[in-house]
Curated annotation (Swiss-Prot):
The lineage of its organism: Viruses, Varidnaviria, Bamfordvirae, Nucleocytoviricota, Pokkesviricetes. It comes from the Viruses. InterPro entries: Poxvirus_E2, Poxvirus_E2/O1. Induction: Expressed in the early phase of the viral replicative cycle. Keywords: Acetylation, Disulfide bond, Early protein. The modification N-acetylmethionine is found at residue 1. This is Protein OPG064. Interacts with host KLC2; this interaction promotes IEV trafficking by engaging the host kinesin-1 complex. Interacts with protein OPG056/F12. Disulfide bonds join 496-535.
């Protein structure tokens, strides 16, 4: 349980109405300790500034921009890849950032700065050369474009749009463009020429051709707004738009229809009532299912005919359509119809729109995995919800007032997330708790210290363990005396590094000192410094030609190196998958969407990071919003690596999948020197891996896309292995398992 004793004391002693207010009364040391673990309000008092700068500078965004010193800001954001949280601070200190002349820093900050014409002139003076200014300007934001008079070149426009497609909108509003360029952009990028530069090129045929390319209602409305009215009255244009409306593109043409099609209501058919009040008696029409689907969004224009529409829906069993207009048909909904809507409609309906909140309807919602089950609390007590297997604690619940209405819901939240700084921060500092609800929350947490509320199941889950202050054991790397009497052949390789402090060089030297590695392809390493360059010479290891054996031994090496504090980041296979982040934020995670490479490649020293630098390295590699701990980053590395070697290894394996999986797990444990044996069957894992293997074998792609939850059993296995790794590294905790 997160310790809130000091916060509770401050809350009571100072008669605070919010927990945020109480946080401001904490002693600085106590406050900084909580800030370090990510447990803090959405803003901090000035008194904590110096301590935050010293101990957790990445949290400077919690102060108002004017409070943050420019040098402190620049020093901090220079080290971070993801600076989204500093957006207002970056813009506030724009001049200080531009004056640095640091191109990479300016590029990083461009999306957040409101750039003026004077700023562009300054940047041009700082960075001479067309390519430099074009590259820097490609990161500009739309707010800047709306405020400047600078005219972008066509090359600059293409570069900007290549980086962010939707930047076409402010650019096209900003300046008149050549018609040939506009046509090219339409053909190449599908960008509608909403620019006065196209007006002279328009004719009815061109207007229709452009409308055929429109994919956003806003673009259609804005394009028609610049077209000459005489051309909009052409019959060919009218006929095309009427047909487009009948195809369901209603939002695209609402202003146009009201201005130009008042005399064509009969041609519009059932859709006419959307634009003109009760223009058509729809009871005289033969209404199709497609038309009902199209008008369901606009049911407020058909209230006169609701009974007629409902009769058609029920006669034809169109439950999906009934669900889409549920707020207009409350009087006809029985318990049976509510259950049918819940079970048969493609999209979930809001629980608040279901007029009957019976236990049976609730059970059906639970089975269909509704996220707003909490709304049944208006009729059903929380114990019944839990008894029936409901989880009323979801993202949706934060959008309601239920936490202030039910103290039992807060208690349930604490049982689920009381160990998690991120999730408790959301409820305590970001949700508008009343004074009474805040008091209950602090009292419950303070009176249930330790892990008492999380026994017996939660304490052995990976999300719980990731939020605890545990460590992974690092064996000391043995000293290896350098051998200078090695005879190198001419074809032996040489690697060069810029300094002895280069992280890849340091990893290489440490790897060379670790005994028992099987596949690392460098041996007999020596190095010397020459002209400020570090030259490393080595003899390549002999290749292992048996692919399955190579994969297994390589995983052993990765695990062995991890046991010595050198961790492998498999980002070349998984470019954006960070399951640990989801877990520490209390969110569900699924398998990665894509594995970038289907071949297990050789290992290189630059892919291994020392444990003490791992949190920063992983956070920057994946451009996270905040820096995770070294411990959390290590588990992310181990889990990702194990998943990759299970999936890609099984694709390459010629053994029975079950034998391969068990072998991989044993090798992984052996490399980490963990005395564990898997006690559960892996048949479900094998089924998943075999499906992936069949799919990969039938294609010739160098990568593979994965469906959501396609590897749920495999992920569960990886999670359990990580749990065993943590427990083995923290024996005192393991005894409570």
């Amino acid at each position: 349980m997160i310790s809130v004793t000091d916060i509770r004391r401050a809350f009571l002693d100072n008669e605070c109405h919010t927990i945020t207010k109480a946080f401001g009364y904490l002693h600085e040391d106590k406050a900084i300790a909580l800030i370090k673990i990510g447990f803090h309000p959405t803003y901090l008092p000035k008194v904590l500034y110096n301590n935050v700068v010293e101990f957790v500078p990445e949290k400077l965004y919690l102060f108002k921009p004017r409070t943050v010193a420019p040098l402190d800001l620049i020093s901090t954001i220079t080290k971070l890849k993801n600076v989204d949280k500093f957006a207002s601070h970056i813009n506030y200190h724009k001049n200080s950032i531009l004056i640095t002349g640091d191109k990479s820093l300016i590029v990083k900050c461009m999306p957040y700065m409101i750039i003026s014409d004077d700023d562009i002139r300054f940047i041009r003076e700082q960075f001479v050369g067309t390519n430099s200014i074009e590259y820097i300007l490609s990161f500009i934001n739309k707010e800047s474009i709306y405020r400047m008079s600078y005219q972008f070149s066509e090359n600059e426009i293409v570069t900007i749009i290549n980086r962010d497609h939707f930047m076409y909108e402010p650019i096209y509003e900003h300046q008149v463009l050549d018609s040939d360029f506009l046509k090219t952009m339409l053909d190449r990028y599908g960008i509608v020429p909403i620019n006065s530069g196209i007006i002279d090129e328009l004719c009815p045929e061109a207007i229709i051709e452009i409308l055929m390319a429109v994919v956003r209602p806003r673009d259609a409305i804005r394009f028609l707004d610049i077209v000459n009215k005489n051309q909009l009255t052409e019959d060919s244009v009218k006929n095309y738009i009427i047909n487009d409306i009948r195809r369901g593109k209603i939002d695209y043409y609402i202003p146009y229809v009201e201005d130009f099609l008042e005399d064509r209501t009969e041609d519009l058919g059932i859709y006419a009532n959307i634009f003109f009040e009760d223009a058509i008696d729809i009871t005289k029409l033969d209404i199709t299912k497609t038309e009902l689907e199209h008008i369901s969004k606009y049911m407020n224009y058909y209230t006169t005919y609701i009974d007629h529409i409902v009769n058609i829906i029920l006669q034809n069993n169109y439950i999906d359509i009934l669900a889409s207009i549920i707020d207009y048909v409350q009087d006809v909904l029985t318990e049976e119809l509510c259950i049918r809507i819940v079970c048969e409609s493609t999209n979930p309906v809001p629980v608040t729109s279901l007029p009957i909140h019976s236990t049976l309807v609730m059970v059906m919602c639970i089975q269909m995995k509704y996220v707003d089950i909490v709304e049944f609390l208006d009729e059903i007590d929380i114990d019944t919800l839990i008894e029936k297997g409901a989880d009323p604690i979801t993202e949706y619940t934060f959008t309601t007032r239920w936490y202030n209405k039910h103290n039992d819901l807060i208690t349930l939240y604490i049982k689920k997330y009381g160990f998690c700084p991120m999730m408790m921060k959301r409820l305590m500092f970001e949700y508008p708790l009343t004074k009474e609800a805040s008091d209950h929350l602090l009292k419950t947490m303070d009176e249930n210290r330790g892990a008492i509320m999380f026994f017996p199941r939660t304490i052995c889950t990976l999300p719980y363990l990731l939020c605890c202050n545990y460590k992974l054991i690092q064996k000391p790397i043995p000293f290896k005396e350098e051998n200078r009497n090695i005879v190198y052949k001419k074809n032996n390789r040489v690697l060069c590094f810029d300094s002895l402090e280069n992280s890849a060089f340091k990893s290489l030297i440490k790897i060379d000192s670790i005994p028992g590695l099987k596949t690392y392809n460098m041996k007999d390493i020596t190095y010397e410094k020459s002209n400020n360059i570090i030259c490393v010479r080595f003899i390549p290891q002999e290749s292992i030609h048996n692919e399955e054996r190579r994969i297994k031994l390589q995983l052993f090496d990765i695990a062995r190196l991890a046991s010595y504090g050198l961790y492998y980041i498999p980002s070349r296979y998984l470019s954006s998958w960070t399951p640990v982040v989801n877990m520490i934020e209390g969110r569900e995670y699924t398998n990665p969407q894509k594995i970038e490479c289907l071949v297990i490649l050789d290992l290189f020293s630059e892919e291994f990071i020392e444990y003490q630098n791992l949190g920063n390295a992983v956070s920057n590699k994946y451009e996270l919003e905040y820096t995770i701990s070294n411990y959390q980053a290590a588990i992310n590395c181990l889990m990702s690596t194990l998943l990759i070697y299970l999936v890609l290894g099984s694709i390459r394996s010629i053994s029975r999948t079950e034998n391969f999986v068990l072998s991989i797990l044993n090798i992984f444990y052996k490399g980490l020197k963990i005395n564990e044996l898997l006690s559960e069957p892996v048949s479900g894992v094998c089924i998943e891996l075999n499906k992936i293997k069949d799919r990969a074998s039938s294609g010739d792609s160098s990568f593979i896309f994965l469906k959501k939850n396609e590897l749920s059993k495999t992920l569960s296995l990886c999670e359990k292995v990580c749990v065993e790794t943590i427990l083995d590294n923290n024996q005192s905790f393991k005894s409570s398992k």
